[in-house]
Amino acid sequence: MLYTVFCDESCHLQKDNSSVMVLGAMYCLSEKRKQIYSDIRAIKEKHGLNSHFEIKWTKVSESKIEFYLELLDYFWENSDLHYRGLVATGKDKLNHAKYNNDDYDLWYYKMYFRTLDPIIRQENEYHILVDIKDT
């Protein structure tokens, strides 16, 4: 089976004044992806939002609370959608010189591996879409 995996991160920069990084992977069978896209666009339009705007959980506001609640209901009720998240704490205390060849990015990608490894099955194929890592 072919799966599509959408990955995103929060507080992933080395010097962003956060001691926590969160990585998330939402995935579904690729054949279900277009219907899920369509459903989410319809939810956006129902709430008067541009159907192509990027959903940002940091932008939740009282004025859009009904949209976000409906979106959450959609995710919880849709058995075709799956999610795995990883919360890495103590990011500000890491010893990259000792454990990561003095390379923060190496640690970052190790955490992505730990996020995705439990999802991946050898008998399946995957399209893994990772958000652009800003600097």
Where are these regions (language model features)?
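Phosphate-ester processing/binding pockets and catalytic centers
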Residues: 1-135
